[in-house]
Amino acid sequence: MSQFPDAKQLFTTVTEDGKSILSIEPYAVPEPKEHEVVVQMEAVPINPSDLGLLTAAANMDTVRSETVDGHPALVADVEPAMQPFFKGRAGKKLAAGNEGAGKVVAAGSSDAAQALMGKTVTIVGGEMYRTHRVMPAMMCVPLPEGAPAKEGASLFVNPMTAQGFINTMRAEGHEGLVHTAAASNLGQMLAKLCLKEGVPLVAIVRSDAQKKILTDIGLTHVIDSTKDDFMDKLIAALAETGATLGFDAIGGGKMASYILTAMEKAAAVRGAEFSVYGSTV
């Protein structure tokens, strides 16, 4: 019998008959092997990549609470036009959750595993939406003494994404960055990293409150897309920073078009040679 009899896990399933199901089911926690530990999960973020697995197939206007195979579940319809896109996972019960943090409550016999007993660690590797996760000790990053799990639960996905933005900028020879939805958790990390590494950043937000978050961090070019002078300020910021690479976290809408248009106009302000085909942006 497992030493964690009440352990549970979240599963996501798209059924053959066009339903999207999120169910909470019992989970048999395996005994940790020599170099493994059991982490009792305390904080797990929801990233867009997680949402893609959890709810991308669902028409959320149809969501309802049901009991499926004796387990509590949220059920939503999958529109007929969407069903072909999810045929590859139809009928498959999938686990979700990229990363998270919690306390080590059991450990294998190795020195490395035993050294983590009782410590709060952050981990990555999928299947994190469960009460307990078995992981190799070498995959666990201990948090500082006294640090709560929620402070370390996003240690991997967003920080690596922010660093990836800057690495891409440098690899492609750009001078600065544009980022939308810039007051998000990722956006704040990117802002701090850009300030630390001297990378010009133009941050696009949608409210005064979001703007204040970033100006308090120290950013200079924070532009509210809801204001009438948005395009004028965007062009001016791009002309000043020379930013020619954008990462659009919104998806859909016209923002990407606005940014590219502003980049063209900013290039003209900076004295780019005229071409009927536009600039090299």
Can you say where each PLM-predicted feature lies in the sequence?
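Glycine/charged-rich beta-loop-alpha catalytic/anionic-binding loops adjacent to active sites
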Residues: 139-149, 175
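Glycine-rich beta-strand-centered segment in the early N-terminal region that forms part
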Residues: 30-45, 57-125
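Residue-level marker of beta-strand positions
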Residues: 119-121, 132, 176
